[in-house]
């Protein structure tokens, strides 16, 4: 599909701010916590990253969909974001490796979005006011009706979401004859993390979020443990904190990324706090505590 009629759509924020735009993806209504990602490429990886489950993603890059969708570039089996907000929503694409258009992809997976709005103004608003709930609709344009629906959406604070995106069955990834064996506690792991394990001669076994240390140790006897990235509030995951504590108590090598890193902190009685605006993008500031400098890293 190269051309289609753009129907009107509306984005309503929790604080009452309204943006009028055009429908993108499936005609419908969606809700979630609105936030922005500053990556200039990799929109498909963003859509399918389980860490973004339940969030409406604003793309700061003006063009989305212009290089299509490739099956090989997903980070999970499904689109994880609740909705998309962008400036230019491109149905046509010009990359021979692509398998389909973003419009076909969104319609197949029932994703509602909005385009043709001033995303620079919106990002500044979120930057200044912080992340908040929002609603996108291309089927309901009455603001009072949308406000009523939005008022019923729960805050992301206190939500346990990892069990919704975690694998339901244990599976392996990589070469069984690899030099190392790592047990992965899947709280929303990205496929690229598993590919990186394989590239480094690691055979990984991936377990559902609520698997205990004893179950993983008995089943796999790994050289170490990895606590994955994922969505939701770490304080709402006492089961995972307990698993991390047991791994630490048994003096097993372990590391965590994203949510897993926060759980490692909680297991050591170090509290975590939600940032006013999270760092979502390709370049992340990291404080070098040795030289007391802030360095920009590519991740």
Show the residue positions of the predicted features.
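Short gly/pro-enriched beta-turn/loop segments at secondary-structure junctions
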Residues: 177-180, 220, 249-250
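Short Asp/Glu-rich motifs
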Residues: 125-126, 216-217, 266, 284
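RNA-binding accessory domains that recognize and position tRNA/RNA substrates
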Residues: 1-214, 232-234
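Glycine-enriched alpha-helix->loop->beta-strand junction motifs that scaffold or abut catalytic
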Residues: 201-203, 220-224
